């Protein structure tokens, strides 16, 4: 509905990042108060809905507007609401955040024990992974210290001057970022004897706990900047999304920049090109 209309308009007008941000901030599309009354005419809260592959995804989306769904459906009970609560717990685990006592109580209260059983298994696996992460090496969390926004990026890369750098602007919630990180593991192993360092920069939209539990599997130098610093980097370097990659040669020159993972072959080619300069 609303999102599709706005996205289509943004794409058709080919707006740049700043215009897009201003558009989404200032454009208000008013819908009639009864616009979503049609929801009560759909079968959204029956066990038969579980046969639809998209139902779990939809329940997850609806869980963020539980108040609206209660109003339109006239109830807060049923499979849709159960799945919504379970989905929120699942997303927590997916974000490397173990279930809280409150979340466990929510699962305990659900009519079907299946939710608790399945999510307890996933939660236990996560807890074991977190313990194993404490023993892992190959990654380092770096503190930036107090610097101006103008000095931020130069401060980050200065201690690594003289090496070829692959700088990855990413986020823990970014699926393509996470897939790319896994895809590059064999490449990094292949190039381990080359003079290449990997720098990962993320912002506060990556929850600190999630970030700390995710990076042990991402070998390299890690930085987590503030929202203000992140916004400055995005604006200064005209970064429109994540992941965005910079290849920087030993002299500090940016030899390659791309938003979106270009694939390991291209990445390796660009790194080797920078090494030979």
Residue ranges and their predicted role:
Residues 163-164, 181-201, 269, 273-274:
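Conserved helix-turn-beta segment immediately C-terminal to the redox Cys motif
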Residues 169-186:
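Conserved redox-active cysteine motifs that mediate thiol-disulfide chemistry
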Residues 1-161:
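Oxidative protein folding and maturation machinery
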